[in-house]
């Protein structure tokens, strides 16, 4: 029997419709729409596509965009100057630096320069520290999207064994803390983990976030597990065409798991939607709603 498909695209659409209605209700009280500034450096096509997707999502919800684009040959000081200006701009509730930055650009200074109250990517040390301490704060978008998707689908987390494969600051580390806060028993696996299949087979919930195409095969999943695929990989088919796949061997694993996210259409739309949610949260706090 095939797994239940965890449709992040459908949930994202419903949540964005709710957000659009909220924005319209708040506008008369605040006198301005929420504002998001996405800062992009360089000409990477994937980054440009991601930024366009975020701007389209903002338009659907009613969030004003204050994005800026910098050349890879530009001075990093110009990016820091722009962040300083946006920190003071009352029209802007959220600031995001699109990662990765081009070679030679250190991502740490711009991430540290963002006002934590406008850090809608949840990567400032203050917001990460709040996550560790279990305090309210802006959370990383992809892990937050995973949690919202699991909760919306009614998947139990408390008391379950969860394995997160990947230890990045963007996904693996914050997601493991969010699962722990939801009372899961959490194991974090990575490239140096011996007997990875043995670890993943013990899990009720498996989250893949390593960027390796189809790494998780059916024999690595126990029957009835929930599988969340955060990976996005472009591979070339024998005919030369490109295909977008996750870190999970989807067709095989869906016959063994109880529930699974597709790629595309699973976690990706939820990541963008949580960026909007974080922007609205900052807007609410700054507007005293």
Curated annotation (Swiss-Prot):
Keywords, in A-Z order: Amino-acid biosynthesis, Histidine biosynthesis, Hydrolase, Methionine biosynthesis, Multifunctional enzyme, NADP, One-carbon metabolism, Oxidoreductase, Purine biosynthesis
Example GO BP: L-histidine biosynthetic process
Keyword Hydrolase (UniProt): yes
Gene3D superfamilies in the record: Leucine Dehydrogenase, chain A, domain 1, NAD(P)-binding Rossmann-like Domain
A molecular-function term among this protein's GO annotations: methenyltetrahydrofolate cyclohydrolase activity
Amino-acid positions noted as binding NADP(+) in the UniProt annotation, renumbered to this chain: 166-168, 191, 232
PROSITE patterns, alphabetized: THF_DHG_CYH_2 (PS00767)
Reaction it catalyzes: (6R)-5,10-methylene-5,6,7,8-tetrahydrofolate + NADP(+) = (6R)-5,10-methenyltetrahydrofolate + NADPH; (6R)-5,10-methenyltetrahydrofolate + H2O = (6R)-10-formyltetrahydrofolate + H(+)
One GO cellular component term noted in the UniProt record for this chain: cytosol
This enzyme's EC code(s): 1.5.1.5, 3.5.4.9
Pfam families linked to this entry: THF_DHG_CYH, THF_DHG_CYH_C
Pathway: One-carbon metabolism; tetrahydrofolate interconversion
Function: Catalyzes the oxidation of 5,10-methylenetetrahydrofolate to 5,10-methenyltetrahydrofolate and then the hydrolysis of 5,10-methenyltetrahydrofolate to 10-formyltetrahydrofolate.
Listed HAMAP family: THF_DHG_CYH
NCBIfam families in alphabetical order: PRK14186.1 (NF010783)
Family, similarity comment: Belongs to the tetrahydrofolate dehydrogenase/cyclohydrolase family.
Subunit relationships: Homodimer.
Protein name in the entry: Bifunctional protein FolD
């Amino acid at each position: 029997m095939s797994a239940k498909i965890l449709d992040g695209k459908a949930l994202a659409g419903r949540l964005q419709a709710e957000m659009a209605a909220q924005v319209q209700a708040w506008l008369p009280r605040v006198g301005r729409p929420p504002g998001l500034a996405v800062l992009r450096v360089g000409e990477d096509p994937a980054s440009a596509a991601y930024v366009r997707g975020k701007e389209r999502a903002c338009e659907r919800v009613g969030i004003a965009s204050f994005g800026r684009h910098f050349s890879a040959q530009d001075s990093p000081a110009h990016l820091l100057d722009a962040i300083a200006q946006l920190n003071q701009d009352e029209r802007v509730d959220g600031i995001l630096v699109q990662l990765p930055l081009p070679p030679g650009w250190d991502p740490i200074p711009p991430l540290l320069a963002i006002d934590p109250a406008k850090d809608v990517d949840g990567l400032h040390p203050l917001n990460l520290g709040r996550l560790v301490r279990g305090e309210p704060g802006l959370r990383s978008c992809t892990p937050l999207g995973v949690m919202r998707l699991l909760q919306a689908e009614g998947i139990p987390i408390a008391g379950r064994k969860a394995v997160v494969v990947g230890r990045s600051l963007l996904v693996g580390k914050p997601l493991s803390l969010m699962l722990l806060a939801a009372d899961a028993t959490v194991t974090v696996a990575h490239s140096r983990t011996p007997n990875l299949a043995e670890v993943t087979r013990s899990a009720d919930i498996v989250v893949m976030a390593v960027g390796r195409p189809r790494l998780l095969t059916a024999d690595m999943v126990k029957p009835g597990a929930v599988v969340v695929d955060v990976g996005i990989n472009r591979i070339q088919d024998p005919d030369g065409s490109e295909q977008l796949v996750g870190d999970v061997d989807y067709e095989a694993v869906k016959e063994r798991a109880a529930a699974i996210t597709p790629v595309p259409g699973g976690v990706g739309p939820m990541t963008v939607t949580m960026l909007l949610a974080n922007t609205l949260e900052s807007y609410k706090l700054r507007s005293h709603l």
